[in-house]
A protein has these predicted regions:
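Hydrophobic alpha-helix immediately C-terminal to the catalytic Tyr-X-X-X-Lys motif of short-chain
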Residues: 157, 161, 165, 195, ...
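N-terminal Rossmann-like NAD(P)+-binding domain of SDR-like oxidoreductases, especially those catalyzing
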Residues: 1-181, 231, 311, 315, ...
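Conserved GTPase G-domain signal focused on the G5
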Residues: 185
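C-terminal substrate-binding subdomain of Rossmann-fold SDR/epimerase-dehydratase oxidoreductases
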Residues: 16-19, 199-334
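Amphipathic coiled-coil/heptad-repeat helices and related helical stalk/stem segments
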Residues: 42, 63, 191-192, 223
Length: 334
């Protein structure tokens, strides 16, 4: 099959593209290669995707004409949409980047799928859509009407837009709410990367909400396994579904939403302890108040995902952090 993987130079997109290539698929990857973080890291990921079955095009999702041309020329079987302007905190200062990439860019993906009869669109949503929810674990049955960041609002909007296109045009869509993904080849703006860099340089790390936070940290290999399994299960329309009695994660249209998380929330301080053990050094900690747009805790109910594909993430934080540190030291030749 021929896949489009958006954000192919990004953390998750790179790993997904690599897995699809290993399984013998043809993959077209796109990425705008922006400088939100180190472009050389993005290029290094792309270099590892070198294969006759992989073709890369530098393209911005918001380029309406370029995206339409790409879809018309390639006639993809399936689309795995992972490109987005990421980061909760960055959205506080750079809101228009999120409107361009996460809203207009996403509309171009939907239009491409519509006009070329793509058989399945799988797209990245986010655990951030749960916003002010306090009930744990977060379930796809819960309300997601109270986001606390613009990033989260754009991800919720993506789910709504997907439903509209599934309803109007019969496009099968599956949204995946990722929970704090980490691992080798990760993003430099994420905590594990920043903490590792600071500790190896002898600098202190900023610990928000004085360490009193929990995250459902999910290792990249587990994310990849789940995504690859999910893309093979194409949602079907369900004429018996109703708003009154049906799940909000499904529809009468061929539309589904799932959580992908480890289902084992970890205290931030325990995450830091795992990093200290992997590095063999103690972190100097700046204890800070919580940042605007952050939530205290996240935890994923992944039973519906397990019911669908028979898989639950397995990797412990201790193992995952150790793997990240080994990659980091090798990549930066430390």
């Amino acid at each position: 099959m021929k896949f489009l993987v958006t954000g192919a130079a990004g953390f998750i997109g790179f790993h997904i593209a690599q897995r699809l290539l290993n399984e013998g698929h043809d993959v077209v990857g796109i990425d705008n290669m922006n400088d939100y973080y180190d472009v050389s890291l993005k290029q290094a990921r792309l270099d590892r995707l070198s294969s006759p079955a992989f073709h890369f095009q530098q393209l911005d999702l918001a380029d309406r004409e370029g995206m339409a041309t790409l879809f018309a020329a390639e006639q993809f079987d399936r689309v795995i949409h992972l490109a987005a302007q990421a980061g909760v905190r960055y959205s506080l200062e750079n809101p228009y980047a999120y409107a361009d990439g996460n809203l207009m860019g996403y509309l171009n993906i939907l239009e491409g799928c519509r006009h070329t009869k793509v058989k399945h669109l799988v797209y990245a949503s986010s655990s951030s859509v749960y916003g002010l929810n306090r009930k744990m674990p977060f379930s796809t049955e819960d309300s997601v009407d109270h986001p606390v960041s613009l990033y989260a609002a754009t991800k919720k909007a993506n789910e709504l837009m997907a439903h509209t296109y599934s309803h109007l045009y019969g496009i099968p869509t599956t949204g995946l709410r990722f929970f704090t993904v980490y691992g080798p080849w990760g993003r430099p703006d994420m905590a594990l990367f920043k903490f590792t860099k600071a500790m190896l340089a002898g600098k202190s790390i900023d610990v928000y909400n004085y360490g009193k936070m929990k995250r459902d940290f999910t290792y990249i290999d587990d994310i990849v396994e789940a995504v690859v399994r999910v893309q093979d299960v194409i949602p079907q329309a369900n004429a018996d579904w109703t708003v009154e009695s049906g799940s909000p994660a499904t529809s009468s249209a061929p539309y589904r939403v799932y959580n992908i998380g480890n289902s084992s929330p970890v205290e931030l301080m325990d995450y830091i302890t795992a990093l200290e053990e992997a590095l063999g050094m103690e972190a100097k900690k700046n204890m800070m108040p919580i940042q605007p747009g952050d939530v205290l805790d996240t935890s994923a109910d992944t039973q519906p995902l397990y019911d669908l594909v028979g898989f639950k993430p397995q990797t412990s934080v201790k193992e995952g952090v150790k793997n990240f540190v080994e990659w980091y030291k090798d990549y930066y030749q430390i």
